[in-house]
Amino acid sequence: VALLKTRARLLRDIRDFFHQRGVMEIETPLLSMAGNTDPEIQSTRTRDGRYLRTSPEFALKRLLATGSGDVYELGRVFRESEAGRSHNPEFTMLEWYRTGYSYYQLMDEVAALVRHIGRDKFSAWQVEKLTYRELFERYLGLDPCTADRAALASAAKRHDVGDIALSRRQWLDLLMSLVIQPALPGQQLTFVYDYPAEQAALARVRPDTPPVAERFELYLGRTELANGYQELTDATEQRQRFDAENELRSQRGLDVYRIEEHLVDTLEHGLPECAGVALGVDRLLMALSGAEDINEVIAFPASRA
C-alpha cells in the first residue's frame, strides 16, 4: 500500500509540474501500424499485424505538427525481451515536447522536474553537463568520435568487459554501460550530450568535425533515467534512417518492421522546431524509494502479471 501511495504522489507531482508550466497532457494510441525500427529495441506485434508502442513519440510529433503546442504523455509502453534489475517489458514512460526549445533548455527543465519530484532527496545534488566526448576522455582516456573498433575493443579488454566481435556503436554502448556508468558519481545529476552521429536515432545531427547528434541522456546517480533530442525535422533524412535501421535489423536476423509513414508525412508537411525527452518513471520511483529492483516499484511486474 505504501508503494501505491508513493507512485500516486509521484504521478500527481508530475502532472502538477506540467500544469504549472502550461504543457498539455495528451493520450495517444497504444497500438500502431508501425514498429520501432531501432535494432536495439524489439516491438511486440499483435495477431492482426499491429504493434504495441515502445514510446508515444511518433503520435505526439504528429500532434505537434497540427499546432497542439507543448505536450506531454504519461503512460504505459512495451518493449519485448527487456527484463532485469532495471527493466520490465511493460513500464511507465513520461515523454514531453517543447516547441522553440533547444536541447540545452530541455536539459534544464528535466533537472527542474527531477528536483521538483524529489525535493526531499535530490535538491542538494549537483548537476553536471558534459559532452559524450568529454565523458569518454575522462573515464577511458580516448576520443569516442574518432576511435576505431580496435581502439574501443582494446579499452574494453583493459577493463575486462568483452572479448567479442562488435560494431563501433556496440563497443561504445558496452563501454558506456559496463565501464563508465558504474563509475559515475552516486549523488549527482549527470547530463551527457552531443553523441556520435551514428547514435543519433531521431535527433538532429550537427555538421561539426566530426558530426555530432544533438542528443542528451540524464544519469540520476548511476541510473540512466532520460533520453532527449533536438528533434529531426527533415523527412528525407528520417526515411533514410528508418531504412538503414531496418537494413541493420535484417543483417542481425531480427524482424524488419513497417516504418512510420505517418511521421514521414508529418515531417514533409512541417514539424515545428522542438526538443523532446522520454523519462523512465519506474526508475525515478526506484531512486526515490531506494529500491534495488524495478519489481519492487511495480505492483504487477512481468513475473506476476
Segments (PLM) and residue ranges:
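TRNA-binding/sensing appendages of the translation machinery
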Residues: 1-42, 279
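Hydrophobic face of alpha-helices
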Residues: 7, 11, 15, 19, ...
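Short alpha-helical functional segments enriched in proximate histidine and acidic residues
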Residues: 17-21, 117, 182
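Short aromatic/hydrophobic-glycine micro-motifs
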Residues: 23, 140-142, 161
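A translation/RNA-centric and nucleic-acid-associated enzymatic feature enriched
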Residues: 29-35, 39-63, 72-99, 144-305
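Acidic, low-complexity central loop/insert segments
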Residues: 102-128, 132
